[in-house]
Amino acid sequence: MRTLLIDNYDSFTYNLYQLLGEVNGVAPTVVRNDVDFDAIPLDEFDAVVVSPGPGRPAVEADFGVSARAILESGLPVLGVCLGHQGICHLFGGSVDLAPEPVHGRVFPVEHTGVDVFAGLPSPFKVVRYHSLVADSLPADLEPIAWTDGLVMGVRHRSKPIWGVQFHPESISSEFGRELLANFRDLALAHNARSGYQVHVRKVSALPDTEALFRDLYASGKHPFWLDSSSVIGGLSRFSFLGDGSGPLAEYLSYRLATGTVTVESATGTSTVESPFFEYLDSQLTQRAVPTPEGVPFDFNLGYIGYLGYELKAESGAQAVYQAEEPDAAMLFADRLIAVDHVAGETYLLALSLDGNDADALAWLAVTGNRVAGAPRAAGETGKSSRWLDMTSPEVRRVAAARHDHDGYLKRIKECFHEIDHGESYEVCLTNEISLDVRIDPLSTYTHLRRISPVPYGAFLDFPGVSVLCASPERFLSIGVDRVAEAKPIKGTRPRGATPVEDAALRADLLSNEKDQAENLMIVDLIRNDLNVVSEIGSVHVPKLFDVETYAPVHQLVSTIRGTLRPEQSPVACVRAAFPGGSMTGAPKLRTMEIIDRLEDGPRGVYSGAIGWFGLSGAVDLNIVIRTLVATASGVRFGVGGAIIALSDAEEEFAETAVKSRAMVTAVIDTALSSTGPSRTLLDAQDAA
């Protein structure tokens, strides 16, 4: 928290400075009380602390700009000693001589246990340094602490203003750190009040999410479906469905080439010149709102969409290629259906602004009734009756790779050269496959989710691009507790034809030195990325080399966690870790330069992230793998693997065929089974 500390020429100000810095994680900015108040950049601060000092608050030379800071800053304020007396004086109280001067003496203070005193014992010992005392309070101020009948603490009844007569920073005061931490939390909570309110309705029903999506959103504006088609304990439990038809919805698209965010809303279209991560961070800060009680997930509305791989240029990498689709696209969702696959319940969330609740409440009523009447979940997902890959005749007729077999092997050998010469430890080399077919994106996605259920699936139907994602990999999640978690995947085996073969493949993956080396390098890379923004000592690895099994493959997965430092936002954490290390290799920046040179083109959505940024401060993003991208120019997907010194070039190429199975099977099956003229994305847009 960024704090303005006004120094009233006191000898204890920098003791207060140190304690505030320890509590807030960032040092306060100190100004003397005789500076020009109008020159203070108040918009750069989250709170004001007014220090102790000599003299009287009614004397301008003694109190100076402290008075205007209390009355005009609009920020949360804590006054200490003279600062406390100033608050009492400015709001109409009287400050006179105390019954006796008290300096450097310890007294017990009793309190009501509210606000800055929350969670503190009553009484506790504090140090007093004062000859004056507030002996009467105005109606606007409420006494909340006393000693020997004298007021030791106040709060304003309607403004975020508090005062304490004693010195919490003194070496002999108890619970000074905790009192300042309470002020920090009060200030942050006040600043988070954005005028937005989240309304909730719970429906005791588990609808079929595909049927519900088709009924409510398939033909809507900017529909989205974050799809936990495979429910795994501790990983996936909720699916989120919605579109951009709400009154507060906004659609953001970003192009690195121009550095502009285009914002489309009900009031029109505007452009903002800003890096995307900075714009997103500022909007989330302005719109922050807590999650209502009883909601069992952290996504309380906010931004849903994708971050494309080329957005790496905002994380320190070079901008080399320009993708066909936007480099980032996010919908500000003000309406949402959340399906709880574990509890068998559904939650509806709607956002209102400045007390205009009628539209939100009406939507909850109408949509809740439709959810209650929707078909129930039928458990349709499961294994495909057949798997196709890049060697299948049906696929070979319509597929074209950016790099053919020989070209891909040549690039793998170049990776070996870079590794041998110390330029990289691991290069996550990928290929792009284009499919000359015509699909209906939603039909293809629903088939993909049936044959390859995953915890982090997604369907996005945005202007100019549809994204059909069957990702098993989490990039990064951040809870409201500010704990960040990454789950990189490195190491893949196909499923076996028999239980015995399947178990053998799983065991081989778990014990293979090459796969463990791949995984370990990315674990260490992500530990580094999280350490950039995390508390000292908080980054740890609760799971190393864990095998997770999905319909087409076994995967080797590790888990890394860290707790963000107070001054680091969730968006800053995402930016520090983006793109996910499992899609780059290490060292990250040098390896991305190698990737740009070898791959000869943009990755686009592939290798980026899909998910949400909540108004609660929470985040959940996947890694974009096993994903089809449909644009006006056709259908494509990326596929690749990590190249290390232990890699075998032919085996790496063969692994890309395994990883492509779900995508090509979904495309070929739906293209062949179309009952009418199939359509490209362009056809669908023209029809709309």
Region roles according to the model:
Residues 2-6, 10-79, 91:
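Flexible gly/pro-rich beta->alpha loop and the following alpha-helix that scaffold active-site loops
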Residues 6-7, 166, 523:
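Active-site flanking residues adjacent to catalytic metal/cofactor-binding acidic residues
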Residues 36-39, 134-135, 331:
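Short loop/turn elements that flank and shape the SAM/SAH-binding pocket of Class I
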Residues 61-68, 145, 178-180, 443, ...:
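Charged helix-capping and loop-helix junction motifs
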Residues 64-80, 85-174:
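Pocket-forming structural segment of enzyme catalytic cores
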Residues 193-688:
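Extended alpha-helical targeting/anchoring segments
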